[in-house]
Amino acid sequence: MAGCIPEEKTYRRFLELFLGEFRGPCGGGEPEPEPESEPEPEPEAELVAAEAAEASGEEPGEDAATVEATEEGEQDQDPEPEDEAVEEETATEGEEEEEEEAAAPGHSAVPPPPQPQLPPLPPLPRPLSERITREEVEGESLDLCLQQLYKYNCPSFLAAALARATSDEVLQSDLSAHCIPKETDGTEGTVEIETVKLARSVFSKLHEICCSWVKDFPLRRRPQIYYETSIHAIKNMRRKMEDKHVCIPDFNMLFNLEDQEEQAYFAVFDGHGGVDAAIYASVHLHVNLVRQEMFPHDPAEALCRAFRVTDERFVQKAARESLRCGTTGVVTFIRGNMLHVAWVGDSQVMLVRKGQAVELMKPHKPDREDEKQRIEALGGCVVWFGAWRVNGSLSVSRAIGDAEHKPYICGDADSASTVLDGTEDYLILACDGFYDTVNPDEAVKVVSDHLKENNGDSSMVAHKLVASARDAGSSDNITVIVVFLRDMNKAVNVSEESEWTENSFQGGQEDGGDDKETHGECKRPWPQHQCSAPADLGYEGRVDSFTDRTSLSPGPQINVLEDPDYLDLTQIEASKPHSTQFLPPVEMIGPGAPKKDLNELIMEERSVKSSLPERSGAGEPRVSFNLGSTGQQICRMENLSPVSSGLENEQFKSRGKTASRLYHLRHHYSKRQRGFRFNPKFYSFLSAREPSHKIGISLSSLTRSGKRNKMLRSSLPWRENSWEGYSGNVKIRKRNDIPCPDFPWSYKI
């Protein structure tokens, strides 16, 4: 081809840098050095010693002669034994010449100058399986190449091209040197290939091809469609990471397909009982897909057959290597404007179109009626043991592997196809560690909120989804792949403009005040290539789950106040139910007090007040108090004396039956399931005289746990023994510290 693509310069530069770091299997990064190279340093050391002795004018044998002479005393000073010494030197010289002649074929007479030590190279990827069959060579070769190239952040298009060229070279070479013939019962069994030797051959071919492409780069056309992806995976609370995922946006380049529309392949595999089945499926399923006869005209059926072939071959491998594991899997294959999905088990994929979740599949679980009937027809059973399980063991009804559970747990995949009309937003592929705790609508909200907060930047969307699943209580491995089917930056801008028009006359925003003025012009450009978050095995960068909490908060959602700096408690209307934004300073607890009992209590308090000595400020006006529980009927009393705080004293106990009716006014706090238990000192309502506006004085708040309301307060340092009080225009500021999980709000005066 005479043309030149814009990326060629970038690709050449990458190859130059890559060759500077990657010197092939013989450049120091070999998994296991050749055993023949170990005994070489010994003769080289002897030769260097001999050369040094010659350079100093002494014979190599003189040292030994000198030692012998020293042991004999002063005999070496006598002139008589000179002939004997000459004979010894001659014999020693003859022996040295014989040694030099024997070492001459292997070493040159003059040792080469010492070469500078090269920096240590990163280890090459090692194959996880010791032996493979001939049918598995292609998948293993492609996987080894892609692992090595992606480790150096190779562009996806170039990585696919290099992996394809390397795999073709390996397949055309003679693999008989790597074969291990195996005999069983006197008959020739399956011929297997040693993967370590195959890996050396693969990396040697890769190095040769990179050197050739630097000089003469084969020009190719770049794909027209390139899907933006965001990937994140964590081990979470499990001891091992058994999830695997695959992203091949350049499917045509990886398999050298020139007559097909643009194609892409994405998959998530969730292993159980070990990671071998998940690794095997991630390496070989897409290869088995391309090799199916119906792949050109019926990709959905080809996907189902690829699952079946992968399952059969892994069961054979498990029998040879005594493996007892399996994996679920979900695959999405995009060809042009068609989306094809195939799956086994409970890993799932969902489509989002115009901001709404679209169901594409139903996971294979034992509690599905059709799956239960299939299992029982085969002689199995579905029982409840913490979850619905097949024969009391596995909680999935279909999987790759699990040979000991066949045929009840089969590897037959289901498939579905959907036409993409351009209104689709993105796909979310994930394992059950995500979908068991996050429903589709919540996932859509998490993605939407993240895109709005980050001006359409989608690189960390998968991280946000994983964090939401973990905060919702997931302890399993979590893997999430988000594939964006269109430019979400434009979609976010359009939605923001429409929301701004709708909310411009409603007196404020509901997005936490993050309007155009706070964001400014900090929009990030849309990435031009795949932007995938690293699929690490741990959970990086997380200090506390509060930072990543989204709509899945277990407590009530805290809405942002109109004025973010302070709140005027005297402006609260008793006729409106109180939200979790704030509560008035005096709030009753329980289902609501009878008016009769409240009036009796208030009248008695008036009599108590008349008997108390007059205090300063007693004649000042008093504001109203709201008595009752949140969201229920509220009794409003104007210009009354403050409510007594002594509900636990003798006066309360002397009320008899009336006290029992007022029991719900007493503070009661049940033991929490998690965390610590509060033990407040005061069982009283908020009542204070001359409120101070100094920072550090806390107000009490009403909290809810289960079906009970509780009101907790700390002591008021300016008047600890106050029996009455009033409230002026009290301004309070929100606290910056993280409150107790049971307190959805916290303020300071």
Curated annotation (Swiss-Prot):
User: Where along the chain is composition biased (Basic and acidic residues)?
Assistant: 515-524
* Pfam short name (any one): PP2C
- Can you state which reaction this protein catalyses? O-phospho-L-seryl-[protein] + H2O = L-seryl-[protein] + phosphate; O-phospho-L-threonyl-[protein] + H2O = L-threonyl-[protein] + phosphate
Q: Which GO terms describe its biological process?
A: cellular response to lipopolysaccharide; cellular response to xenobiotic stimulus; positive regulation of stress fiber assembly; protein dephosphorylation
Name the coenzymes or cofactors required.
Answer: Mg(2+); Mn(2+)
- Give the start-end ranges of region 7 X 2 AA tandem repeats of P-E: 31-44
Known EC number: 3.1.3.16
| Domain PPM-type phosphatase: from-to ranges | 224-485
* GO annotation, cellular component aspect: cytoplasm; nucleolus; nucleoplasm; protein-containing complex
SMART domains xref list:
PP2Cc
| Residues the record lists as Phosphoserine modifications | S532, S545
Composition-biased stretches, type Acidic residues, lie in 31-45, 69-102
Keywords in UniProt for this one?
Answer: Cytoplasm, Hydrolase, Magnesium, Manganese, Metal-binding, Nucleus, Phosphoprotein, Protein phosphatase, Repeat
- Biased region (Pro residues) positions are 110-126
Q: sequence repeats at which positions?
A: 31-32, 33-34, 35-36, 37-38, 39-40, 41-42, 43-44
Instruction: Kindly give the Gene3D superfamilies that the UniProt entry links to this protein.
Output: PPM-type phosphatase domain
One Gene Ontology term of the molecular function aspect? metal ion binding
Catalytic class of the enzyme: hydrolase
Q: How does it assemble?
A: Heterotrimer. Interacts with PAX1 and ARHGEF6 (or ARHGEF7).
Q: What is this protein called?
A: Protein phosphatase 1E
**UniProt source species:** Mus musculus (Mouse)
